[in-house]
Amino acid sequence: EEIIDVAYQSPEMEVGFNVSYLLDVLNTLKCERVRFNLVDASSSCLIEDCDNSTAEYVIMPMRL
């Protein structure tokens, strides 16, 4: 289990991801900051580089 710092301004939610999929995306982006676009804890998550949105990745959360 990893806990990361986020800038989040909406109601609290808990979401989990398969670490292999998440690491694949993060290793591909190779940037300092990423943006996770979430609607709710069960919908797909769009991940992109904060400074360059030319590449977008979608991963599905796991049920907790």
Curated annotation (Swiss-Prot):
Keywords: Cytoplasm, DNA replication, DNA-binding, DNA-directed DNA polymerase, Nucleotidyltransferase, Transferase. Pfam families: DNA_pol3_beta_3 (PF02768). GO terms for molecular function: 3'-5' exonuclease activity; DNA binding; DNA-directed DNA polymerase activity. It is found in: Cytoplasm. The keyword Cytoplasm applies. GO terms for cellular component: cytoplasm; DNA polymerase III complex. It comes from the Bacteria. One of its GO terms (biological process) is DNA strand elongation involved in DNA replication. Gene3D superfamilies: DNA Polymerase III, subunit A, domain 2. Confers DNA tethering and processivity to DNA polymerases and other proteins. Acts as a clamp, forming a ring around DNA (a reaction catalyzed by the clamp-loading complex) which diffuses in an ATP-independent manner freely and bidirectionally along dsDNA. Initially characterized for its ability to contact the catalytic subunit of DNA polymerase III (Pol III), a complex, multichain enzyme responsible for most of the replicative synthesis in bacteria; Pol III exhibits 3'-5' exonuclease proofreading activity. Forms a ring-shaped head-to-tail homodimer around DNA which binds and tethers DNA polymerases and other proteins to the DNA. The DNA replisome complex has a single clamp-loading complex (3 tau and 1 each of delta, delta', psi and chi subunits) which binds 3 Pol III cores (1 core on the leading strand and 2 on the lagging strand) each with a beta sliding clamp dimer. Additional proteins in the replisome are other copies of gamma, psi and chi, Ssb, DNA helicase and RNA primase. Belongs to the beta sliding clamp family. This is Beta sliding clamp. It comes from Actinobacillus pleuropneumoniae (Haemophilus pleuropneumoniae). The lineage of its organism: Bacteria, Pseudomonadati, Pseudomonadota, Gammaproteobacteria, Pasteurellales.
